[in-house]
Regions:
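S-adenosylmethionine
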Residues: 1-438
Length: 438
């Protein structure tokens, strides 16, 4: 069967659903290999992310129609992908969905397999019956409607109330923006003008400076990206480095740096300083170095393979003017870009990660100079990983205090900022800024 959007999407979904692969990595590899034209590439991307985002909802639609065990590995992903098109892609006729599903089933099925008849029968039944949902007062109504595991749906409701929780979950099921940040070393006005001429139609972020949403993908294949004028970075993530007050000659530490987006953003502000980038994995630090070279700040970045929880075994106390702890987290703010997280993470994972984050905070904070600045951030919106960790850290370190901060477009008068995904249609993020007392 000829390679097209649906073959690429199905192959990717088989890896994600059956093997637990990361959707973004698997899809990027598949798209590079397939070299699809723009429209086909966009459809493949939509099919992969949409199917995973709505997987729980789609499984609920299919569960009463699947009477036999789905033995062949392509059948479940194909049914889910087809159901996604039926319920969410109005521009794709149902007849086309059925025809393409039959072609894929015959192409992927074993010789003499009747899998395609099974797929065809289930999809016809789905079309006849239509959508089903739990009763509105049922405990799992929001879970199914918003395609979130019940524990996570309940968690959002418990923390933000039913109305806001539903908006947050709906935002997580929307399409992620194609966001870039223009290097501080590049002429912003010229780059914006050139991006517009290249038909990327950049729209300025209301949240972060030098951040823009593009009307289409493919920026990484252009000279804008290759020459280090822009990098791919969500607007909420771009806010983290903006929380610092740089003079330009500081010694900075990025304690959890890979893949290096924030390391580079810090380095751009240090013409006479340096940022030391840590990561526990040597392989990931190679990516940091590659990105620093591409963005023309390699001379300002030094890397070290080290577990941040052992930082004081290697560095001297009060060695750094600025410290960033962009801590490993549950990724609950990234459910739009990494939709499978909702199905793989648990409440226990959040608790475990919160402990690791606090360990890093406790360890690395001892490396901050008196009067220096420490920024703690996560790409999670959980209370345990954010506000609760801040409370615990301050209770254990009376020599530290939260420090109000203001970026070019937003302020945090209490020293903490939580960006919920429905506020700006961005990733969810948390930032807290500390300084030492006295």
């Amino acid at each position: 069967m000829k390679t097209n959007a649906r073959t690429v999407a199905l192959a990717t979904l088989m890896k994600v659903i059956n093997q637990g692969s990361y959707s973004n990595i698997s899809l990027n590899h598949a798209l590079k290999a397939a070299k699809l034209p723009g429209e086909e590439s966009r459809l493949a991307t939509n099919l992969v992310y949409g199917t995973i985002q709505y997987q729980l909802y789609l499984e609920y639609q299919l569960k009463d129609l699947v009477k036999a065990r789905l033995r062949e590995p392509y059948i479940k992903p194909l049914l889910l992908m087809s159901a996604y098109q039926i319920f969410f892609l109005d521009k794709v006729p149902n007849r086309a969905v059925l025809d393409e599903a039959n072609k894929l089933a015959k192409a992927y099925g074993r010789p003499k397999s009747s899998g395609y008849r099974l797929v065809n029968g289930i999809l016809h039944s789905l079309l006849r019956r239509g959508e089903v949902l739990p009763e509105k007062d049922a405990p799992d109504y929001l879970s199914v409607k918003c395609s979130m595991p019940l524990w996570l749906s309940d968690y959002f409701v418990a923390n933000w109330g039913k109305s806001r929780a539903e908006k947050i979950m709906a935002s997580f099921n929307s399409k992620a923006k194609n966001e870039i940040r223009i290097s501080a070393l590049a002429d912003e006005k010229r780059v914006v003008r050139d991006l517009d001429r290249a038909h990327f139609a950049p729209q300025e972020s209301p949240l972060a400076s030098r951040s823009y949403a593009l009307s289409r993908g493919g920026i990484v294949m252009t000279d804008f990206f290759k020459d280090g004028e822009v990098t791919v970075q969500d607007e909420a993530a771009s806010l983290v480095a903006e929380a610092f007050d740089f003079k330009g000659n500081e010694q900075a530490l990025d304690a959890c740096s890979a893949p290096g987006g924030k390391t580079i953003q810090i380095a751009e502000q240090l013409p006479d300083g340096q940022v030391t980038a840590l990561d526990i994995h040597e392989k990931k630090l190679r990516l940091v170095k590659e990105n620093a070279a591409r963005m023309r700040v390699a001379d300002r970045v030094k890397v070290k393979a080290l577990d941040a929880r052992k930082a004081r075994e290697y560095f001297s106390r009060q060695e750094f003017d600025k410290i960033l702890i962009d801590a490993p987290c549950s990724g609950l703010g990234l459910l739009r870009r990494k939709p499978e997280i909702r199905y793989t993470k648990t409440a226990e994972d959040i608790s475990h990660l919160a402990e690791i984050q606090l360990d890093i905070l406790n360890e690395v904070s001892g490396l901050l100079k008196k009067g220096g600045e420490l920024v703690y951030s996560t790409c999670s919106i959980s209370v345990e990983e954010n506000e609760e960790n801040v409370r615990k850290f301050l209770a254990a370190h009376p020599d530290f205090a939260l420090k109000p901060f203001e970026t070019a477009k937003i302020s945090a008068p209490k020293g903490m900022l939580k960006i919920l995904p429905d506020s700006y249609n961005s990733d969810g993020f948390f930032i807290a800024k500390f300084t030492t007392r006295g």
